[in-house]
């Protein structure tokens, strides 16, 4: 089983990565840092666009963990750009057979912020045919989800 952690945080060794490490403890996994890729907004075609590489890495994985810090009450921009740009580029069901987990952390997110982020990830999973495994917002939740991998 191949596992990919898609890190949306601009800090490759920050709290989002630490939460993913807790979720993935004891497992081998690859890390894709979105900050290493040129990823414009939906509708943009930038030189050196990295979306195809991100999509290919996600298609190659059996289990995908998307990580985002809570910025402005929601997903960070890099994760949002990837989700937005999947639309029309990846067919519905295009990630069938894969499992998706979500790590989402911030200084003091309110319940509605976490619910909004998870709603988005559940919809993303459903649209592209993935089984949604759950969300971890703290170490205890990550350790519990680890048992389901």
PLM-predicted stretches and their roles:
Residues 6, 103-105:
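Short hydrophobic segments within beta-strands
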Residues 91-97:
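Short, conserved loop/helix-junction motifs that constitute active-site signature segments
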Residues 109-110:
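Rossmann-like dinucleotide/flavin-binding elements
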Residues 113:
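Rossmann-like NAD(P)(H) cofactor-binding subdomain of soluble oxidoreductases
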Residues 3, 98-101:
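Hydrophobic beta-strand segments of well-ordered beta-sheets in folded domains
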Residues 1-91, 118, 122, 126-149:
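N-terminal beta1-alpha1-beta2 submodule of the flavodoxin-like/Rossmannoid cofactor-binding fold
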């Amino acid at each position: 089983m191949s596992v990919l952690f898609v890190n949306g945080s601009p800090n490759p060794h920050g709290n989002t990565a630490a939460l993913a490490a807790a979720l993935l403890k004891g497992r081998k996994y690859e890390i894709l840092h979105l900050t290493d890729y040129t990823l414009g907004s939906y509708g943009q075609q930038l030189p050196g666009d990295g979306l195809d590489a991100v999509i290919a890495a996600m298609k190659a994985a059996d289990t995908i963990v998307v990580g985002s810090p809570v910025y402005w009450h929601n997903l960070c921009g890099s994760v949002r750009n990837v989700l937005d740009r999947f639309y029309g580029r990846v067919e519905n069901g295009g990630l069938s057979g894969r499992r998706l987990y979500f790590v989402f952390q911030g200084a003091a997110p309110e319940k509605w912020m976490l619910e909004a982020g998870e709603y988005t990830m559940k919809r993303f999973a459903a649209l592209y045919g993935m089984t949604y495994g759950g969300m971890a917002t703290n170490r205890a939740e990550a350790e519990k989800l680890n048992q389901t991998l």
